[in-house]
Amino acid sequence: MDAVQELERRIVELEIQTALQEDVISGLNAMVAELRQTLDLQQAQLRLLYQKMQDRNPDAQEPYSLRDEIPPHY
């Protein structure tokens, strides 16, 4: 009878571990989905900013440089 109880205890422990892992996986999936939305939004914003910079000076022969934006006191 001792061996049966030990097996039952081990099965219960495995079930608990599985339930905890499923909870962690569910939380990670939610976080990945949220981060994907954030990334999509940031990519859209970056495309918009790039387009605005191109529209600002479409005839420029050289690419846009951040040095052009440095205030004069630097």
UniProtKB/Swiss-Prot annotation:
This is Protein SlyX homolog. Coiled coil: none annotated. It comes from Neisseria gonorrhoeae (strain ATCC 700825 / FA 1090). Belongs to the SlyX family. InterPro entries: SlyX. It holds the Pfam family SlyX. Residues 54-74 are annotated as: Disordered. NCBIfam families: PRK04325.1 (NF003316). It comes from the Bacteria.
